[in-house]
Amino acid sequence: MKKNQINEDEVFLINPDYFVKVETFGSNNDKVVVVDDFYAYPDKVRQLALDIPASKNQRIRGGNPAWRVNAFYVLDGMAWIFDQLCNQYFPEIMAQWPAGAMEDSFKRATFMVNVMQSENLPAVKPHMDNPSGLHFASTIYLNNENESNGGTSFYEYVGTNVNEPVSSYITESTNDWTMTGMVPMKFNRMVLYLQNVWHTAYVKPGMFTNDVYRLNQQFFI
């Protein structure tokens, strides 16, 4: 019998030679931190995402319309990089956090990966993860170079009723939504932003079909 085991400190090791750039989008100058070459061993993280079956169980995927992987591993060793980046680029937010909050967040964090394809996209509009303005979201792209397409897009709402339903999956600007920017998908790229910024997965028909799935690891911090 062979049973796979994991060394989380190795699999989720942060690459010391990561590269950071900062984008600002829209009239609110919404800040988005983009980190390339994020993991030291991204292929190990990608393989883990592929090995664990994805589920549409509502308890796992919440309001996410896609499939989701959600598994408990020790992710405490990742807290430092997020603490460093958030303090450097969002100091006014982090000044409101209690000491040790980032470490506590990663003690509770799970290995969460959204898994979706681009056919039969649901009618979905851009969303906020949390309106408080005190919390962060992070996406890490796990599609390799041959599979990467689209990205994460950001928006401003310019309509009059944000709760009005939509009839299609929104990506480009509409009468109610202005796309302010997009961070393209790239293997081992991490994207960090505030949860109160309107955003969505930038996906169009034909991007992820047959045996190709959009794979993005997700943290809500």
Regions found by a protein language model. Give the residues of each.
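Fe(II)/2-oxoglutarate oxygenase catalytic core
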Residues: M1-L192, N196-I221
